[in-house]
Amino acid sequence: DLGTSAVKLLMMDENGNIQKIVSKEYPLYFPYPGWSEQNPQDWFAQSMEGIKELTSECDKSQVAGISFGGQMHGLVALDKDDQVIRPAILWNDGRTAKETDYLNQVIGKDKLSEYTANIAFAGFTAPKILWMKENEPENYKKIAKIMLPKDYLAYRLSGSFCTDMSDASGMLLMDVENRCWSKEMLDICGITEEQLPKLHESYEVVGTLRPEIAEELRFSENVKVIAGAGDNAAAAVGTGTVGNGRCNISLGTSGTIFISSEKFGVDKHNALHSFAHADGHYHLMGCMLSAASCNKWWNEEILGTKDYAAEQTDIKNLGENRVFYLPYLMGERSPHNDPDARAMFIGMSMDTTRADMTQAVLEGVAFGLRDSLEVARSLGIQIDRTKICGGGVKSPLWRKIIANVMNLKVDVIESEEGPALGGAMLAAVGCGEYPDVETIAEKLVKVVDTIEPEPELVAKYEERYQQFRKLYPAVKGLF
């Protein structure tokens, strides 16, 4: 799982037993306000170190396949010599407001939706390509290959220039309904299909290890490399959110609400993304750019502590907090599509406590996720329960808040590994251990706890949420 702050590596046997987990961190760079970049070489170096540590005590001849979940939307540009042209521009980078406006207003949202089933968001890949064309023309002219983050790893490991349908959906370059590149979008961005990777389903084998990689890792050259999926689709596989009408909420660095569907569908208001799913079907997804990262920022940067649980012990009266928090540290995607939006606290008084502020952060993220749920409900999608994954799931209090803010039964699954487990499950399908993604999800995903919404608390949070909805429109002019 190639995340924003670290790569998590997981080793699973053919029966779904997790043998070992390793995590390797790498830096994130903010060279200018609103920018967010990483060095792809850091991803590769840490992944290689992680694989060596992960397999240090196993019979390496038994390694059958490698697959991926990964942060989406990032632009990795290589030249004709396969050298990285510039640092990768990440999913949470907000520099492309001008290019996003051009796509939505000049090309037009209706045309974009016709070409790709989506409109432009600042984090998507196509606006980043246009930004390079306008601001770094010499770098733009050097582009021979355009990749997404996890696909850079696949290329370094296997030599296969490829991507999968779920991750490619978030580039704004793909005709999602027909699962192919959009000629119209390529023309708009001034690129050719030769500069883009070959499209695969997430469970398909794209190649085997390069000989020099196999030698360094002491693996067989026959180890299969499977396409993998964008982190949210991989997490959905890892939580069993496949097939028709199932929901998963991810509380990672970003927050998502993910609804699987066997049929292609589009939100006509474009507040939800319409993407291909890793199971070969489709999904709708709402994405907020700052979720667990809000809690990390509040605890570590403001309070100066890493003991998140201790900060939550004094939170007592759920649904009665008078402080609101708008969770827009990096702008916002769903449903506002506003890269200039910013976080703020509202409603403090002399008796506001540290615990009130901590509670407001947890509730603000839950309210932000509910914004996307309300869009899904407006489309007639009936949801009464959801799986949940991501780092924020470790907080029982946050799980309870989400269940009652959303008025959903929240199923906690046995494994907390989300995208990494989903990647391993896709590898198992690609290696022929299971016939399809639905079968392995049915066999391996186990629910260990369910949080039931409490009617009295649901009513309190309903009132609070209706107040929350008024805040962004009221303060938007300040950004």
Regions picked out by a protein language model, each given a short descriptive name:
Residues 2-86, 114, 142, 214-215, ...:
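N-terminal glycine/serine-rich phosphate-binding loop of ATP-dependent small-molecule kinases
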Residues 25-27, 91, 289:
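A generic structural motif
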Residues 1-2, 249:
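Two-metal-ion RNase H-like nuclease active-site motif
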Residues 86-100, 413-414:
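Short, acidic/small-residue loops that bind anionic groups at enzyme active sites
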Residues 52-91, 119-125, 154-175, 198-201, ...:
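Short beta-strand-loop/turn "lid" adjacent to the catalytic site in phosphate-handling enzymes
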Residues 16, 39, 66, 93, ...:
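Residue-level signal for inorganic ion chemistry
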Residues 194:
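A conserved beta-strand/loop element that lines the FAD pocket in flavoprotein oxidoreductases
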Residues 97, 104-119, 127-162, 172-183, ...:
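Active-site core segments that coordinate phosphate-bearing ligands/cofactors
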